[in-house]
Structures are given as C-alpha cells and as structure tokens.
A protein has these predicted regions:
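Conserved SGNH/GDSL esterase-like catalytic core that processes O-acyl groups on lipids
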Residues: 1-63, 74, 152
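Aromatic/hydrophobic pocket-lining residues that form the small-molecule binding cavity
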Residues: 61, 65, 69, 108, ...
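Generic hydrophobic alpha-helical scaffold/packing signal
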Residues: 31, 66-73, 112, 162, ...
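Hydrophobic/aromatic beta-strand patches that form the interior of the parallel beta-sheet core
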Residues: 10, 82, 121-123
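Active-site segments of SGNH/GDSL-like serine hydrolases
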Residues: 45-49, 71-108
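Alpha-helix N-cap and loop-to-helix initiation/capping positions
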Residues: 56-64, 99-106
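Catalytic His-Asp segment of secreted/periplasmic serine-dependent ester chemistry enzymes
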Residues: 88-185
C-alpha cells in the first residue's frame, strides 16, 4: 500500500509512555521489521509525562533511554535518529498563575545530554513552541492549538509544530548539501 517514493510515516504511539518500553522489543522483531521496512529516520518524542513540578534529576529517565537509542541503532543501522525534546507544560504556582513547570527545562537538559551522549540529533520543541509560557499562547490562539490542560497540543498545534520541524529538517539538509558540495570542489 505504500508508494514507491515520497514520505511514509509509521507511528508507534504509546500514550503516557516514557519511551523506555521500546528497549524491550526483541531484536529479532526489530531486525525483521528493518528488513521489510527499512527506515531512513526514527523520531523519538517521549517524556512529557515524565516531567513533574519539582523534577531536577532525570537520570532515571536518561540512562534507560540511552539503551533504547543503542537498541534501535543496532536494529536499524542505516537510520538516522532524532530526539524531539518535550514541549512547554504549565502548572499553577502558589498564587494561581500559570508558569512553565520547572521540571520541563531540567528534563530538556537531560534529553539534550541523551542526544549528545548517543551522537543523535536533537530538536528542541520547547524553543520551537516559543519557550516559557508558550503552551498558554497556543491554548489562547484562535483557533486553539493546545488543550486546556496546558500540557498537550491538539491536531492544529501538531500541524503547526510539524511545519516548523519540517522547515528545520529541510534547512539542515540544504546546509549539509552545501557543505558536501564545498568539500568536493
């Protein structure tokens, strides 16, 4: 059913998952999958439900995710891997004001470290959203691009951020091709 050319997307959505469960998929199954559907890019976007208000140390998240990235890299050696950092998530402070949950920024640091330690690409969705308090702006946009839980984007928000990610990937490809052309001159 897939076309011979173009982009084909497979989505392994596991709501509320940290992504660590991917490390438990047997290697034989992943290698069979790679033989049938070899991927060019694997995007890992997990962790939003890992973040919590007082979260400072997310080693318990990062260390198992290192194993997940290594597991996927072994199963899909031809594929590039992109880690998408968590987006903005709000909580109400002691005065009842919406604020970016401090644990979000700490988790992003751990996700960046995960990407660096595994030599994996990283895209900062929090910054792409607009940083501090951006989910509030997405909720209040007309039409709304996020849910009133001030945590989850909706389909419009997903489409908006997908467009930003696409432009980022295309810009990266353009820069790569320019560099390769320069190196061959």
């Amino acid at each position: 059913m897939d076309p011979e050319s173009g982009i084909v997307v497979d989505n392994f959505s596991t709501r509320g998952s940290s992504g660590q469960q991917l490390g438990n998929i047997p290697m034989k199954i992943l290698r069979d999958y790679n033989r049938l559907r070899p991927y060019d890019l694997i995007v890992l976007q997990y962790g939003l439900n890992v973040a919590f208000e007082g979260g400072v140390n997310y080693s318990y998240y990062k260390n198992p995710m290192i194993k997940v990235v290594e597991h996927l890299r072994k199963a899909f050696p031809q594929a590039s891997i992109l880690i998408v950092g968590v987006g903005d998530r709000e909580y109400r402070d002691e005065d009842g004001n919406l604020r970016t949950m401090p644990g979000v920024k700490n988790l992003i640091r751990y996700q960046q470290a995960l990407a660096a330690e595994t030599h994996t690409a990283f895209w900062n969705m929090y910054e792409a959203m607009g940083g501090e308090g951006s989910i509030v702006d997405m909720v209040n946009s007309k039409p709304s691009m996020a849910n009133y839980d001030y945590t989850h984007i909706n389909f419009r928000g997903g489409k908006h951020l997908a467009g930003i990610l696409f432009e980022t990937l295309m810009y990266g490809m353009e820069q790569y091709e320019k560099r390769k052309a320069y190196e061959t001159e």
